[in-house]
């Protein structure tokens, strides 16, 4: 591991033991009149932000996509203006240091950052190496690094993940490793940007436990987040952004007492998921859909998975997906949801059984031609240099009708302003909408969405729901893989709950539905239900 380079203040900054006793006197964020415009951007991302965060406090930054939450996290951790360049005004001190004048390596040991997509911050393929990386970077001796790895693993309960390949971890496990790595240097401040956007209920519970642990140790915590319900009882303050401004700064009790209507009017996600969970539980106790109705796609004695020594397999009860119907596929990470949709779209072959299209046995290539899959990580399927070109891939750009359709899709998805922007320059939520736009342009009969509302605010989540309904009304069969209980309760006609078995293994066990389960995402049952009601209340 790394050698002992000259770092005179490293020991004082980092402490001892499990991160050491924290000197929280410098763990304050102070922003005074902060404004920032990214290079080549027409409008400021932040406008006259004044905010103070006392040491040891946990604050939540919330608001619609593009409101300035992520930009402010970059100011708080010093990435603006040292890494993201543009016009910066105001005064920002983080952990007692002026971010405009202090070298970024002075801030590094004091601030831990966790980004929305943990893949963007990994430097190693092995969990242990990833945890060691921050300490190696500042030249700590190998003995100290090993001690820190042991302490962090014990603190966050991740000892069983040490030495494993990061590529073999679930989304929740990857995010836990990212948080653990961010605390390796004993920071005074931890900044998290939408840490639960891709997580299921169990993984969110793990994330909450990590936040509580850090808060108990006296760390200052800043979380930019759309999904708010999981933070009840953890956050001390909620700061609402809009158009680059801070429009409200609530104490937790005041914020949690707001009516659902007031929360919705601010464009925020629900603070209480119980009405949505009751809705899904009610669906889980409803009769199955009419089996006499013809299905666009059906499965018979299907087993999905991967062959080999460490292969995953799962038996799937017979399913039917009908034109004009929105089916929600729910369940914990690792239960086989993504494997199932890849099988249904012909990307991988089933282990056994068959899949039918319009009652006729289908080969994988037939399924590929019939369906369109929007992947969970849309970065893998964005290829063009502009949003407009992305929507027109494979289509005749000289056809006025197709061009008009693309313009309408961009307008419907609130993407018209980004028509000439490179897709990779957009936010996570905007990229999701570009991929949804591609699905609307493809004209196929089966459209499968893998976590389409990941990273989306309330307005755009509801917009996705409306688009799903629009597609269904056009006779499309829609399958939505989702952890989003608001989306599932409000917009799905049927729910398929695909959970792990009672022993926690993701195998072939299927049990009867338990309608009393408080959280459909945390259920260990498999249930299919049907309804045409979409009132989450």
Stretches found by the model and what they are:
Residues 62-64, 330-332:
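The feature captures the beta-strand-to-loop junction immediately N-terminal to the Walker
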Residues 77, 345:
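Helix-to-loop junction immediately C-terminal to a conserved catalytic motif
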Residues 85-97, 353-367:
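Conserved ABC transporter NBD signature motif
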Residues 143-161, 401-418:
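Conserved ABC ATPase "signature" region
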Residues 165-169, 173, 422-426, 430:
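Conserved ABC ATPase signature
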Residues 182-183, 440:
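ABC ATPase C-loop
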Residues 190-193, 447-450:
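Catalytic Walker B motif of ABC-type/P-loop ATPase nucleotide-binding domains
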Residues 225-226, 482-483:
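H-loop/switch region of ABC-family ATPase nucleotide-binding domains
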């Amino acid at each position: 591991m790394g050698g002992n380079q000259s770092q005179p203040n490293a020991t004082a900054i980092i402490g001892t033991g499990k991160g050491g006793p924290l000197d929280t006197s410098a763990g304050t964020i102070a922003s005074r009149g902060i404004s920032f415009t990214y290079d080549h951007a027409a409008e400021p991302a932040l406008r006259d932000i004044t905010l103070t965060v006392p040491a040891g406090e946990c604050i939540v930054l919330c608001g619609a996509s593009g409101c300035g939450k992520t930009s402010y996290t970059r100011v708080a951790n010093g990435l603006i203006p040292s890494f993201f360049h543009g016009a910066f005004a105001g005064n920002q001190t983080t952990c007692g240091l002026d971010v405009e004048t202090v070298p970024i390596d002075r801030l590094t040991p004091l601030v831990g950052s966790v980004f929305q997509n943990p893949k963007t911050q990994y430097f190693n393929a092995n969990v242990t190496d990833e945890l060691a990386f921050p300490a190696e970077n500042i030249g700590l001796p190998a003995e100290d690094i090993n001690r820190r790895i042991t302490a962090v693993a014990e603190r966050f309960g991740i000892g069983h993940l040490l030495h494993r390949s990061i590529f073999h971890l679930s989304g929740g496990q990857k995010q836990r490793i990212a948080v653990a790595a961010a605390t390796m240097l004993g920071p005074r401040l931890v900044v998290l940007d939408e840490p639960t956007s891709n997580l299921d209920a169990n993984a969110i519970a793990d994330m909450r436990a990590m936040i509580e642990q850090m808060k108990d140790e006296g760390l200052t915590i800043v979380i930019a987040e759309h999904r708010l319900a999981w933070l009840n009882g953890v956050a001390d303050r909620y700061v609402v952004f809009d158009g680059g401004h801070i429009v409200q700064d609530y104490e937790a009790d005041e914020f949690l007492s707001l009516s659902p209507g007031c929360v919705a009017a601010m464009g925020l996600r629900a603070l209480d998921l119980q009405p949505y969970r009751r809705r899904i539980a009610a669906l889980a106790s409803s009769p199955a859909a009419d089996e006499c109705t013809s299905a666009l796609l059906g499965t018979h004695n299907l087993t999905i998975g991967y062959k080999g020594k460490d292969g995953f397999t799962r038996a799937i009860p017979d399913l039917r997906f009908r034109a004009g119907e929105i089916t929600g596929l729910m369940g914990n990470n690792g239960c086989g949801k993504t494997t199932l949709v890849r099988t249904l779209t012909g990307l991988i072959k089933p282990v056994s059984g068959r899949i039918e299209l319009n009652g006729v046995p289908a080969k994988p290539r037939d399924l590929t031609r019939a369906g369109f899959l929007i992947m969970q990580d849309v970065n893998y399927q964005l290829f063009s240099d502009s949003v407009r070109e992305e929507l027109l891939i494979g289509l005749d750009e000289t056809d006025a009708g197709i061009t008009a359709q693309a313009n309408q899709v961009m307008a419907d998805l609130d993407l018209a302003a980004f028509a000439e922007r490179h897709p990779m320059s957009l936010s996570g939520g905007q990229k999701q909408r570009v991929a949804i736009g591609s699905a609307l342009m493809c004209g196929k009969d089966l459209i499968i969405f893998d976590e389409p509302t990941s990273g989306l605010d309330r307005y755009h989540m509801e917009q996705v729901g409306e688009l799903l309904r629009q597609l269904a009304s056009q006779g499309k069969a829609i399958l939505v893989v989702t952890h989003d209980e608001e989306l599932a309760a409000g917009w799905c006609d049927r729910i398929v709950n695909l959970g792990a078995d009672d022993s926690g293994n993701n195998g072939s066990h299927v049990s009867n539905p338990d309608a009393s389960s408080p959280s459909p995402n945390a259920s260990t049952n498999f249930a299919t239900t049907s309804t045409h009601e979409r009132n989450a209340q």
